[in-house]
UniProtKB/Swiss-Prot annotation:
Its main location: membrane. F-type ATPases have 2 components, F(1) - the catalytic core - and F(0) - the membrane proton channel. F(1) has five subunits: alpha(3), beta(3), gamma(1), delta(1), epsilon(1). CF(0) has four main subunits: a(1), b(2) and c(10-14). The alpha and beta chains form an alternating ring which encloses part of the gamma chain. F(1) is attached to F(0) by a central stalk formed by the gamma and epsilon chains, while a peripheral stalk is formed by the delta and b chains. This is ATP synthase subunit delta. It comes from the Bacteria. Keywords: ATP synthesis, Cell membrane, CF(1), Hydrogen ion transport, Ion transport, Membrane, Transport. Belongs to the ATPase delta chain family. GO terms for cellular component: plasma membrane; proton-transporting ATP synthase complex. It comes from Heliobacterium modesticaldum (strain ATCC 51547 / Ice1). It is found in: Cell membrane. The lineage of its organism: Bacteria, Bacillati, Bacillota, Clostridia, Eubacteriales. GO terms for molecular function: proton-transporting ATP synthase activity, rotational mechanism.
Length: 185
């Protein structure tokens, strides 16, 4: 089964539990903390090692979860994923869970790349314009890429708005290459 399909199935199941129990935010926080915990290289090597038996993995993770203030729902979910030998999918499950939870909350995530760091007022103006255009609350993920020369690129949902100088130069170049040259004779 493909990574995306596995992650989607587990994320959807946890989402439904979170909606039913009204613990969506808490589950997102707990799963995020767990994914951060297993980012530690030694723990990752242990957890993802194929010859370590499931019982040992569940024992160690169970002890870690007991010290980290995880709800019974989060603990049961994490241990179920390990029991099914899907531990290498935790980061993908978390990303998919956040995406699905944001959809339920009517939140759109937008990735904004600009040539220079934007001032807080510019960020807020961009956020409000995107919110007005989408009808959703907007969470911005900002990045800086000097190669854009100027302007910015906004990606959200299945849309990309390229307002960068580098993008305009690329478009102009492609337009010139497609245009037939006039005959000089």
């Amino acid at each position: 089964m493909l990574t995306g399909a596995v992650a989607r199935r587990y994320a959807q199941a946890l989402l439904e539990i979170g909606i039913q129990t009204k613990t969506l935010d808490a589950l997102e926080g707990e799963l995020g903390r767990f994914v951060e915990m297993i980012g530690h290289p030694e723990l990752q090597r242990f957890l993802f090692h194929p010859s370590i038996v499931v019982a040992e993995k569940k024992d160690l993770v169970g002890r870690l979860l007991a010290t980290g203030a995880f709800s019974e729902t989060a603990r049961a979910f994490i241990l179920l994923v390990i029991d099914r030998r899907r531990e290498s999918y935790f980061a993908d499950i978390f990303r998919e869970f956040v995406r699905l939870a944001n959809k339920v909350r009517n939140i759109e995530e937008a990735r904004v790349t600009s040539a220079v760091e934007l001032a807080p007022e510019q960020v807020e103006r961009l956020r409000s314009q995107l919110a007005a255009a989408t009808g959703k609350a907007i969470v911005l993920r900002m990045a800086v890429d000097p190669d854009l020369i100027g302007g910015l690129v906004v990606a959200f949902g299945d849309r990309i708005i390229d307002g960068s100088v580098a993008g305009k130069i690329r478009d102009l170049r492609e337009s010139l290459l497609r245009s037939p040259l006039p005959s000089l004779s």
